Amino acid sequence: MATENDNEKRVSPQRVLLHVCCGPCASACVPRLKDAGREVTMLFANSNIDTAEEFEHRRAEAERLAVHDGVAFSSLPYDHADWLEKVAKGFEDAPEKGARCARCFRYNLGKAAEWAAAHGFDSFTTSLTVSPHKPSEMVFAAGREVAENGGTAFLPEDFKKREGFKLSVARVKELGLYRQSYCGCEFSKIPKASCRRA
């Protein structure tokens, strides 16, 4: 016979941690996750960003989105020196969508997986798949790999599907969000940058 506590467990929404690369990309993810009945918390964990000023600008915009969309928000400390040592060293000349990016995905999603496990989330996912410039399968591979070590399930949501990027562009205009002109690290500042202004 089901108890009252059993019923509460059955109807409580799944708690999902959304690793947020930036406000514009997250703007397409939060509505989809909420529409699926999930309780969303946004986590800004992006030490790949090349300067503290740019990091803070993007963090503040992501938090502004969280307030607007009514979801919890947290961020991890900025440590670009650690990212350079553990991710970029030896891969400075790797092309975009190459080995350096794969290492970066593992680094940032690894931080998210650890945080999700420490705070009792059912799963974690990422806004990285909104961008048409980010290969979703590479992101998924990184998420699954770190999930094996982190103790929290990875939710492989391809947010660019069902016109996710188009939705993000529309919401950026609606909310006046800052859309950066490059992905984040100094090595992504190339003529064909991986992120464009709306």
Predicted regions, residues:
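Nucleotide-activated chemistry modules centered on ATP-dependent adenylation/adenylyltransferase
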Residues: 1-198
